[in-house]
Swiss-Prot record:
Disulfide bonds join C37-C172, C42-C102, C163-C214, C271-C318, C375-C420. This is Sialic acid-binding Ig-like lectin 10. Residues 26-138 form the Ig-like V-type domain. Expressed in B cells with high levels in pre-B cells and B1a cells of the peritoneal cavity. Contains 1 copy of a cytoplasmic motif that is referred to as the immunoreceptor tyrosine-based inhibitor motif (ITIM). This motif is involved in modulation of cellular responses. The phosphorylated ITIM motif can bind the SH2 domain of several SH2-containing phosphatases. Putative adhesion molecule that mediates sialic-acid dependent binding to cells. Preferentially binds to alpha-2,3- or alpha-2,6-linked sialic acid. The sialic acid recognition site may be masked by cis interactions with sialic acids on the same cell surface. In the immune response, seems to act as an inhibitory receptor upon ligand induced tyrosine phosphorylation by recruiting cytoplasmic phosphatase(s) via their SH2 domain(s) that block signal transduction through dephosphorylation of signaling molecules. (Microbial infection) During infection by RNA viruses inhibits RIG-I signaling in macrophages by promoting its CBL-dependent ubiquitination and degradation via PTPN11/SHP-2. Glycans are attached at N195, N246. The chain crosses the membrane at residues 544-564. Disruption phenotype: Cd22/Siglec10 double-deficient mice develop autoimmune disease, which is not observed in single-deficient mice.
Length: 688
């Protein structure tokens, strides 16, 4: 019987031609993760109708060495066949062998399952082991479930989360699902045949940044996936970090409200905010937006100030905003720097005249005017501003406001260099100006004397700018250095002083008018000399003496009247002790040169003889230029125009004329001596 079976088996497994009719189609390499389920598709073909065999068809899967008689199959459709112990319950022949389907299902894959597997078919006396086989490669379990959840959860709004584990064959057993996390309060139960699990809950702000885990448990293994919940909320925890020269500033309170930085340093301000969804960050200086971030970008925004300057001071605000709200913080940046842009504003006679920006400026000021100097600088911390001057003959009035220097009444003693100094702990700056006091001509009383060659007169005047000086003889003008047969004029000047000497070589007629004129841009002054030569007739000594005493009394009376009127006018106009001259004003002083007799005269008659023409200043002096009117401007610290100490000048009387002229041409001397001695000596009588 055994021999018959062997022969039949040989015939069935015999020649090569018959073996080619058997073929198995299966994947050569099959990979599976430990603990999971794997399905291996398989089909085969075999010769048909060689023998009519009604025996059942069995299929077997073996692993390892091809010796079916020495091993147990791992899976078969023959219920009477004993299976390998480790494969029981895990390997399953799912294919319908009658339909030549040899598909294999492996559950709970283990590391020991890694080997080669071949298939064998049996039907009665027909038995054949296919040469085609597959190799199972077992790998570590890395497959995880997938969790489907909204990216951002709205607080107070219900949310549904799905955990899904996918595999390729429905016959694989479903794992057991479980949820873990702070948001888990209720779990929906699902049958084990389902490959997903659903979790519903209502998120709150307390759930933000917490973990939610979905875990799958198989028979011996488990796998899980964890997600972090992101619950939407308005910006919070906004913070500003400060870096000086790329170094973090230590010992600063969180979100400082004030920051001091020295000019020239580099500064980096870093703004951060916590929000969900990410907020849009922006830096704002006052009302100007300096920079902003993208909502999908970083949660930080840096503001770079590589070279801090004075103009960078201000209120810097970092603002974070999303659809749920906003938050902001303001930093007051104070840039420290030494005094700079030092300048002086000059106000003369209560009007702003100019602004001085550099050193060594000469400032002309009219004597008697008010002057206000305001020194201004930019610095932080505020600079200590002070004034200093070289000449201290008269101490100027220092205003209570720093940097303001007031001179209510400028005098010549104030001339000199004024220096404004501004200083703070970071540095100092100075600016100087030279004060030049201008004033109109002031003439000293001229002197005249008779010399051997004729009359010699000297005239001097002082003013700034230096005045011009000339003589007027009758209708003629004598100036500079000039001479001819009738006169010689010599001119000299030194600083504010000018001097002119006149020598008259011609015979002098009666009532000859001689004057000395001086002027500059601020005014003019004239001193007149009335020459009264006597006639050659002689008079009695006694009469001349009597008349001389009478004339002397009359002269004294005239002087008293003139002085009283002058004092009354000065009292009504409240003039200062020093004459205050306006542009274009003229003062005329008169001096009379009269004979001085050696003997008493007799039978004198006095008859006044006024000049036959008006003052030459009315027609021959250059008219002063009108000053252009400046707009009124009251600078802080300068005196108000109503408190001006400048002496007012009468517009109705631009010229003041004070003179007294006496004519002695008709007085005759007593013939007690030679008439030639009558003009030998002269004396000076000055009337101001």
């Amino acid at each position: 019987m055994s021999l018959l079976l062997f022969l039949l088996s040989f015939l069935l497994d015999g020649p090569q031609g018959q073996m080619e009719s058997y073929f198995l189609q299966v994947q050569r390499i099959v990979k599976a993760q430990e603990g999971l389920c794997i399905f291996v598709p398989c089909s085969f073909s075999s010769p048909e109708g060689k023998w009519l065999n009604r025996s059942p068809l069995y299929g077997y899967w073996f692993k390892g060495i091809r010796k079916p008689s020495l091993s147990f199959p791992v899976a078969t459709n023959n219920k009477d066949k004993v299976l390998e112990w480790e494969a029981r319950g895990r390997f399953q022949l799912l294919g319908d062998i009658s339909k030549k389907n040899c598909s294999l299902l492996i559950k709970d894959v283990q590391w020991g399952d890694s080997t080669n597997y071949f298939f064998r078919m049996e039907r009665g006396f027909e038995r054949f082991s296919f040469k085609e086989e597959f190799r199972l490669q077992v790998e570590a379990l890395t497959q995880k479930p997938d969790i489907f959840i909204p990216e951002v959860l709205e607080p107070g709004e219900p949310v549904t989360v799905v955990c899904l584990f996918s595999w390729t064959f429905n016959q694989c057993p479903a794992p057991s699902f479980s949820w873990m996390g702070d948001a888990v309060s209720f779990q929906e139960s699902r049958p084990h045949t389902s490959n997903y699990s659903v979790l519903s809950f209502i998120p709150g702000l307390q759930h933000h940044d917490t973990e939610l885990t979905c875990q799958l448990d198989f028979s011996r293994m488990s796998t899980q996936r964890t997600v972090r919940l992101r619950v939407a909320y308005a910006p919070r925890s906004l913070a500003i970090s400060i870096f000086h020269d790329n170094v973090s500033v230590p010992d600063l309170h969180e979100n400082p409200s004030h920051l001091e930085v020295q000019q020239g340093q580099s500064l980096r301000l870093l703004c951060t905010a916590d929000s969900q969804p990410p907020a849009t960050l922006s830096w704002v200086l006052e009302d100007q937006v300096l920079s902003w971030s993208s909502p999908v970008g970083s949660r930080t925004l840096a503001l770079e100030l590589p070279w801090v300057k004075a103009g960078d001071s201000g209120h810097y605000t970092c603002q974070a905003e999303n659809r749920l709200g906003s938050q902001q913080h303001t930093l007051d940046l104070s840039v420290l720097y030494p005094p700079q842009d030092l300048r002086v504003t000059v106000s003369q006679a209560n009007r702003t005249v100019l602004e001085i920006l550099r050193n060594a400026i000469s400032l002309p000021v009219l004597e008697g005017q008010s002057l206000c100097l305001v020194c201004v600088t930019y610095s932080n911390p505020p600079a200590n501003v002070s004034w200093a001057w070289v000449t201290q003959t008269l101490i100027p009035i220092q205003s209570s406001e720093p940097g303001v220097l007031e001179l209510p009444l400028v005098q010549r003693e104030h001339e000199g260099e004024f220096t404004c100094a501004a200083q703070n702990p970071l540095g100092a700056q100075r600016i100087s100006l030279s004060l030049s006091v201008h004033y109109p001509p002031q003439m000293s009383s001229p002197s005249c004397s008779w010399e051997a060659k004729g009359l010699h007169c000297n005239c001097s005047s002082r003013a700034w700018p230096a005045p011009s000086l000339r003589w007027r003889l009758g209708e003629g003008l004598l100036e500079g250095n000039s001479s001819n047969a009738s006169f010689t004029v010599t001119f000299s000047s030194l600083g504010p002083w000018v001097n002119s000497s006149l020598s008259l070589l011609q015979e002098l007629g009666p009532s000859l008018w001689l004057s000395c004129e001086s002027w500059n841009t601020h005014g003019a002054q004239t001193t007149s000399v009335l020459l009264l030569p006597d006639k050659d007739s002689a008079t009695a000594f006694s009469k001349g003496a009597v008349l001389g005493f009478g004339i002397t009394a009359l002269l004294a009376l005239c002087l008293i009247v003139v002085i009283v009127k002058t004092l009354q006018k000065k009292g009504t106009q409240e003039e200062p002790s020093r004459p205050k001259l306006s542009r274009g004003s003229t003062i005329l002083d008169y001096i009379n040169v009269v004979p001085k007799t050696r003997s008493l005269a007799r039978n004198w008659k006095a008859e006044p003889d006024a000049p036959s023409r008006s003052s030459p200043l009315d027609t021959h002096f250059p008219k002063p230029k009108k000053k252009q009117k400046d707009p009124h401007f009251t600078y802080p610290g300068c005196p108000d125009p109503t408190s001006s100490s400048q002496v007012p000048v009468s517009e109705n009387n631009p010229e003041e004329l004070h003179y007294a002229a006496l004519n002695f041409s008709r007085l005759r001397l007593q013939e007690t001596q030679d008439p030639q001695d009558t003009y030998s000596d002269y004396t000076e009588v000055r009337v101001h």
